[in-house]
């Protein structure tokens, strides 16, 4: 992971921590929708591209096998 990606991930985690830290944030529909719209593209990118590509092949295969058994 590049330093730029690490910074992006840190900022994403900060935003998610802010959101989940106070129950009033996720109980407020407008705040929840805004946070979801802002965060989901980064979550998807990190999950399926950045972090996935950093995993060793054997770990990727393990996750793939687990998904197939669901």
Role assignments for model-derived ranges:
Residues 1-30:
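N-terminal acidic leader/helix
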């Amino acid at each position: 992971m590049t330093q730029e990606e690490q910074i992006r991930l840190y900022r994403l985690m900060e935003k998610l921590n802010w959101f989940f830290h106070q129950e009033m944030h996720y109980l407020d529909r407008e705040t929840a929708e805004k946070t979801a719209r802002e965060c989901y593209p980064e979550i998807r990118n990190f999950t399926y591209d950045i972090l996935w590509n950093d995993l060793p092949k054997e770990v990727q295969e393990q996750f793939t096998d687990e998904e197939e058994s669901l």
